[in-house]
Design a protein with these regions (language model features):
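Glycine-rich beta-alpha junction loops
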Residues: 40-42, 132-133, 157-164, 198-205, ...
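Oxyanion-binding "anion nests"
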Residues: 195-242
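C-terminal active-site/capping subdomain that shapes the small-molecule cofactor and substrate pocket
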Residues: 230-341
Length: 341
């Protein structure tokens, strides 16, 4: 019998936590015991995985020495407090928050891009999961980066409200219903009404005028590609879509590559579906294609008419699946295959 593992899911009742448990089930991850963890308020509720019912336990009193793998998806403050405790008990932590991403001794991993970095988990027994917008962009750019190099990335993101949690989904649906029925809307999660709107502001503003979400894409891209000279210029926008982030990506390559050659590279790459027909509907969208699917979709591949070595791409993925939960499970799969077996 193949080895099975005891796994803790911190934030098990949140949007990402619920999807994590679903993906562990779908991919038949070798679970011995599953420990869904949440706040005391959620303790006692049940989740189902692999044909069994598992009771949600109180994170505050949980003994992490009982598990080999702990997945954290409950916010940076929770990870800051509990992840080092879990790691000190021999549990390998895979953290879905931003808390550890910039730590030099913590590997920041996208399995299709830099799986070799997982080996460095032994530094602190912690592996960081990148930001959702970074993950899909780098999955799409890795084959091109390896083939011809990239000097600069310009990207505008169009990000779904589920990236802000369940409360944001509720706010969007309530605002939409109210507006369609001629009622006033309440604004709590976002700085302005999100229904029928676009908000060019995700996370806090920095001194340089960029938001922290935008700077995450800069820092994380350079760390994952191990290339401090790679220039990244992002604009992050929240739009009234429930699931699926979209990105308009423009790159300047070191060597010229045609759209056709780029398309061939992407078609052969793991985790990518190229949907690039130059006709009505011949492109991927967040709701129709990406939602509830694991792939990163790449469309609108074309050479930049304003730059000799420029290339444009439209990149779409489910932000809760590939942007968080799936990427985490893929890391765990490599971890048990190559390091914990």
């Amino acid at each position: 019998m193949s080895k099975k593992y005891d796994v803790a899911i911190v934030g098990a009742t949140g949007a990402v936590g619920e999807t994590l448990i679903s993906i562990l089930d779908q991919r038949n991850f070798p679970i011995n015991n599953l420990y869904p963890l949440a706040s005391k308020r959620s303790a006692g509720s049940k989740v189902r995985c692999q044909g069994k019912s598992w009771t949600v336990e109180d994170l505050d009193t949980f003994d992490f020495s009982k598990v080999q793998i702990g997945v954290f998806s409950a916010g940076s403050d929770i990870s800051e407090k509990y992840a080092p405790v879990a790691a000190s008990k021999g549990c390998v932590v895979i953290d879905n928050t931003s808390h550890f991403r910039r730590d030099e001794d913590i590997p920041l991993v996208i399995p299709e891009v830099n799986p070799h970095a997982i080996a460095n988990y032994t530094n602190r027994n912690i592996i960081a999961n990148p930001n959702c917008s970074t993950i899909q962009m780098l999955v799409a750019l890795k084959p091109i980066y390896d083939a011809v190099g990239i000097d600069r990335i310009n990207v505008a993101t169009y990000q779904a409200v589920s990236g802000s949690g369940k409360e944001a989904i509720t706010e969007l649906t309530n605002q939409t219903a109210n507006l369609l029925n001629g009622k006033d809307v309440e604004v709590e999660v976002y700085t302005k009404q999100i229904a029928f709107n676009a908000i060019p502001h995700i996370d806090t503003f920095q001194e340089n005028g960029y938001t922290r979400e935008e700077m995450k894409m800069v820092w994380e891209t350079q760390k994952i590609f191990e290339d401090e000279n790679l220039l990244v210029n992002p604009t992050a926008v929240r739009i009234p879509v429930v699931y699926g982030h979209s990105e308009a990506v423009h790159i300047e390559t070191k060597e010229k590559i045609s759209a056709n050659d780029a398309r061939k590279l992407l078609e052969k790459a793991d985790g990518i579906i190229v949907m690039d027909e130059r006709s009505d509907g011949g492109y991927a969208t967040p709701f129709i294609e990406a939602t509830n699917n694991d792939a990163t979709y790449v469309s609108r591949i074309r050479e930049d008419i304003s730059h000799e070595k420029g290339l444009n791409l439209w990149v779409v993925a489910d932000n809760i699946r590939k942007g968080a939960a799936l990427n985490t499970v893929q890391i765990a799969e490599i971890l048990i295959r190559d390091y914990l077996a």
